[in-house]
Regions:
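Amphipathic terminal alpha-helices
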Residues: 198-204
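Active-site Tyr-X1-5-Lys
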Residues: 50, 63-88
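Conserved Rossmann-fold NAD(P)-dependent oxidoreductase catalytic core, especially the SDR/UDP-sugar
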Residues: 25-67
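Glycine-rich NAD(P)-binding loop of the Rossmann-fold in SDR/ketoreductase-type enzymes
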Residues: 15-26, 62, 66, 70-73, ...
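NAD(P)H-binding glycine-rich loop region in Rossmannoid oxidoreductase-like domains
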Residues: 1-21
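Mid/C-terminal beta-alpha module of Rossmann-like enzyme folds, strongest
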Residues: 128-184
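NAD(P)-dependent short-chain dehydrogenase/reductase
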Residues: 77-126
Length: 204
């Protein structure tokens, strides 16, 4: 089973908890009762919180700033402590791809962020590849994996990819919640992951 459902944009803290944490718990219990062999949970790199520009490793402490990543981290904790279910966690970065308006939709929220702030990203194709690799692995060496492409572009570059001027940096404090670069070496070393779109420019 691959569990990707989540409530993110516009969710209150209560809604994020109800859907992303409690909803995941209910689904996991149902999966165990149905003898599901493997349960893959897509989480978020935002669980690490502000990293100060240093890529976060899977074993680093997590300090989520907003309700959404906090609810995802709570769900991770429940799943990883659960007995009788083979759980694998894939922490995703900012996901983009053909026909996906994610970048355009995020522009208003990030308009006040620093233009030089970098963001870990992954193309849809690479997310699908990573999900398949992790789901098919008979016995992965770890239970939690980060997923990132080879290059974390600046927000100015991300904005330019959809023809928008760079963000103005007027709300740098709010941007801290999204300043979460990730280290992607583990999934490459353990599972042989290699992105088909290693850089944003490769997908444009």
């Amino acid at each position: 089973m691959v569990h990707c459902a989540a409530f993110f944009r516009g969710a209150t803290a209560e809604q994020a908890h109800a859907v992303n944490d409690l909803g995941t718990q209910h689904l996991a219990r149902a999966a165990r009762a149905a003898s599901v062999s493997r349960f893959l949970f897509t989480s978020t790199g935002l669980v690490y919180g502000h990293t100060g520009g240093r890529p976060a490793h899977e074993d680093d402490p997590c300090a989520p700033i907003d309700a959404y990543p906090a609810s995802k981290l709570a769900a991770e904790g429940f799943l990883l402590a659960m007995e009788g279910l083979d759980v694998r966690v894939l922490r995703l970065p900012f996901v983009y791809g053909d026909g996906d308006p994610h970048i355009e939709e995020a522009i208003p929220m990030m308009r006040g962020f620093p233009p030089a702030q970098r963001m870990s990203i992954a193309h849809h194709v690479d997310v699908a590849q990573a999900v398949a690799l992790l789901l098919d692995a008979p016995s992965p060496a770890h239970r939690v994996y980060n997923l990132v492409d080879d290059e974390a572009p600046s927000l100015a570059t991300l904005f330019a990819s959809v023809g928008e001027p760079p963000p103005d940096g007027s709300n740098a404090e709010r941007a801290r919640a999204f300043d979460a670069l990730m280290d992607g070496r583990r999934i490459r070393e353990d599972l042989g992951f290699k992105p088909k779109f290693p850089r944003l420019a490769d997908a444009l």
